[in-house]
Regions:
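Gly/Ala-rich beta-loop-alpha elbow adjacent to hydrolase catalytic centers
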Residues: 81-85, 89
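C-terminal catalytic histidine-bearing segment of alpha/beta-hydrolase fold enzymes
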Residues: 127, 140-183
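Short beta-strand immediately N-terminal to the catalytic nucleophile in serine-hydrolase-like folds
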Residues: 79-81, 106
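Flexible "cap/lid" loop of the alpha/beta hydrolase fold
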Residues: 31-39, 108-126
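Active-site signature of alpha/beta-hydrolase-fold catalytic machinery across serine-
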Residues: 8, 91-95
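Serine-hydrolase catalytic machinery in alpha/beta-hydrolase-like enzymes
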Residues: 1-72, 76
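A conserved short beta-strand
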Residues: 98-110
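Short beta-strand/loop motif that positions the catalytic acidic residue
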Residues: 128-130, 134
């Protein structure tokens, strides 16, 4: 995916929403980018957790700088992440719980290995969706990763949709209804 994908959704956001969409630094192919490298050996996929944690911190610093230097309500920041962006959104909200109000994590997983250890439990509103036919990030793996939130008594909304590694109209409408209730 790339940074332009979010702008195709702009009409669904409330008029006073300040939208920032970032391009990940690693070019994969055509118009697709990644935040960190993914390695595949047989049926196993893995990535460098240290590199992902470094990206997490850089993204947080960008968010912090942006909220200080622009006319943005620093207490009403929502992260929307797809795939790696979803993984990073989970990590940012738990690593910096005082900064993020909402996350919308689409087709990703919760990975504790890239979360900073903190004693604060985030008050972040969390929306998670995943396609039941996702062949890139397994649906069942995504559901199992939610045990992290359940184990820490953190409330979240999870929805599944009959789709692959993407977002369909039903998913879009549902997540935007959720967001409008939260902002």
């Amino acid at each position: 995916s790339n940074e332009r994908d979010l702008f195709s959704l702009i009409d669904y956001f409330p008029n006073d929403t300040y939208v920032v969409s970032l391009r990940a630094p690693i070019k994969l192919f055509n118009d697709s980018y990644a935040w960190y490298d993914i390695y595949v050996e047989g049926n196993n996929k893995f990535y460098d957790h240290e590199a992902a944690a470094h990206v997490r911190d850089k993204l947080y610093q960008f968010i912090d700088d942006l909220s200080k230097n622009q006319n943005i309500n620093a207490e009403n920041i929502t992260l929307i992440g797809f795939s790696q962006g979803a993984i990073l959104s989970h990590a940012i909200s738990f690593s910096y719980p005082e900064k993020i109000k909402n996350i919308m994590a689409l087709s990703g997983v919760v990975d504790e290995k890239i979360m900073k250890k903190t004693s604060l439990i985030p008050k972040t509103n969390i929306y998670i969706s995943h396609g039941t036919n996702d062949n890139l990030i397994d649906y069942e793996t995504s559901k199992k990763s939610l045990n992290f939130y359940k184990g820490n008594d953190i409330d979240f909304k999870f929805e599944s949709f009959e789709q692959g590694h993407g977002m369909n109209q039903q998913n879009l409408e549902s997540m935007m209804r959720w967001l409008k209730e939260k902002i």
